[in-house]
Amino acid sequence: MRTPLFVAMFVLSIFATPIAHADDAWMQSQRQWREQRAEALSQPDGWLSLVGLHWLAPGRHSVGKAADRDIVLSAGPDALGELELSEQDGVDRVRWYPPKDVVALRYNDAPVGTESIEVGADSSDHPGVITWSGGSVQLIERGGKLGLRVRDAEAPTRTHFQGLAWFEPDQRWEIKARFEAKPAGSTIPIANVLGQLEATPNPGRVVFEIDGNHYTLEALGDPAESLFLIVADRSNGKQTYGAGRFLYTDAVVGGEVMLDFNRMVNPPCAYNAYSTCPLPPPENRLNLAVEAGEKTYQGAH
C-alpha cells in the first residue's frame, strides 16, 4: 500500500522535472546567444575589424595606404583612387574616382571599372561600401560630417580576440516592462562620443520594477520590431564599460515588452577607437547596479 508521503513525493517529482528542464533550456539559450554575439563581433566585417576613421574636407583627395596619399589608410591597396566631397543643391555629395591601374576593388559587391561612382553614406537610402580582399571603406555621416570608416580583417583587435566576459545569467534580470507610447514624431536629444547632439526618434519609454522600485528608460527603435535602449547604471566604470551599455528587445506586444538585462552588451567603442557610439541620455541613468550582461572588455582596443 502506497503511503500519502509516497504519493506526495511522486506528484512533486512530476511537476519538478519540467521546471528544471525549463531552467536548463533558458540557460542554454543564454549561452547560445552569447556565443552568437562573440561570433558576430569577430566576423571580418564586425566591430573588431575597425582600424580607421577619417573625416572628409571639401575638395578632391587621393586615398590609399601609400604614404603619399592625401588620406593615408592603415589597410588596403596603396592607391584607392580619389574621393571628392562637394556641395550640390545644398547637399554634400561624395564621388569616387577609382584608380586607373585597376586593383581587385568592388562597390557594394559589384566589380569596379574606371568610371566614377557617387558614394552613399550609411544614413542614406543607398549606402555604399568599397571593398577589397580582407577590407573595406564605408562612407558614414555623423552630425552633418562625412567620414571614411576603414575595416581590416587582419586587425590585431580581431585576430587577437580572446572572447567576452559576462555576468552569470540570472532569470531575475529578465523583467517584463510596460511600454508607454509617445505622440508620433517625438524625439530625444542623443549625444555621441564625438560631442555631437542629435534629435533621435523616441517612440516611447519602458516602465518596470526591480526589488519594489520603479524605473523608466527612454526607448529608440521601432516598437513593432525592436526597441533600442542606451543605458547607464552604477556598475559602469567598475564591472562594466564606463560609457554605458546597449539593450535590444523583441517587439512590443499588447503594450508590454521583455527586458532581458542578461543580454545587455557593450557599445562598439568598447572594442576600438574608431566608433561613433551614442551615449545614454540623462533619463536613462539608472540608480542601481545592473550586475547582468556583458562586463568590461579586457582585450586590446
Write out the residue ranges for each language-model feature.
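An exposed acidic His-Trp-rich patch
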Residues: 109-123, 214-263
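Flexible, glycine-rich surface segments
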Residues: 178-236, 241
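Positively charged n-region of N-terminal signal peptides that target proteins for export
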Residues: 1-4
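Forkhead-associated
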Residues: 50, 55-123
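Boundary at the C-terminal end of the N-terminal hydrophobic targeting segment
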Residues: 20-22
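Bacterial N-terminal signal peptides
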Residues: 7-16
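Surface-exposed beta-loop interaction hotspot
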Residues: 131-198
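Extended, aromatic/histidine-rich regions of cofactor-dependent oxidoreductases associated
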Residues: 164-166, 234-238, 248-250, 256-258, ...
